[in-house]
């Protein structure tokens, strides 16, 4: 997991490493590159396990592709993006997690679910649905 401090980031807490897709890059290539840049690990065979998305105030939509990988080489190293560490799965709920990490992880692990959708903002956050 990667910890992003509130002092240096728009959002903070423990979450998965991530990033953006560069021009001419496939989604799978971008996840391999981003994981290496942020953790020092080179992953193999990333598998798409879900999509997280929400509407933007401009009328567009922000889409996050969630991948998992079980094969990797290299040594875990933190980066300017945040501190990284291995965490036992049963200890994750005890961490200071980024917004909605637990329900996102549940969606990613559910064989019959593939989308975490923030429908619209509410007074106390978002109206959310998992498909």
Where are these regions (language model features)?
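Unchanged
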Residues: 21-44, 54-104, 130-131
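Short acidic/polar capping segments at secondary-structure boundaries
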Residues: 6-7, 91-92, 123-125
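N-terminal strand-loop-strand
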Residues: 1-15, 42-43, 47
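Charged phosphate-binding loop/patch that engages nucleotide di/tri-phosphates or the phosphate backbone
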Residues: 107-131
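A generic structural signal for short, non-catalytic loop/turn and secondary-structure boundary residues
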Residues: 9, 79-80, 111
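Short glycine-enriched, charge-decorated loop/helix-capping segments at active-site entrances
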Residues: 15-21
């Amino acid at each position: 997991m990667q910890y992003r401090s509130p002092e240096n980031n728009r959002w903070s807490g423990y979450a998965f490493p991530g990033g953006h897709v560069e021009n001419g890059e496939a989604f799978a290539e971008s996840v391999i590159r981003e994981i290496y840049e942020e953790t020092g690990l080179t992953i193999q065979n990333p598998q798409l396990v879900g999509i997280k998305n929400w509407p933007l105030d401009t009328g567009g939509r922000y889409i996050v592709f969630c991948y998992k990988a079980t094969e990797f080489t290299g040594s875990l190293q933190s980066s300017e993006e945040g501190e990284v560490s291995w965490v036992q799965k049963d200890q994750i709920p005890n961490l200071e997690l980024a917004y909605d990490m637990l329900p996102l992880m549940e969606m990613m692990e559910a064989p019959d679910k593939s989308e975490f959708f923030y429908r619209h903002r509410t007074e106390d956050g978002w109206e959310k649905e998992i498909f």
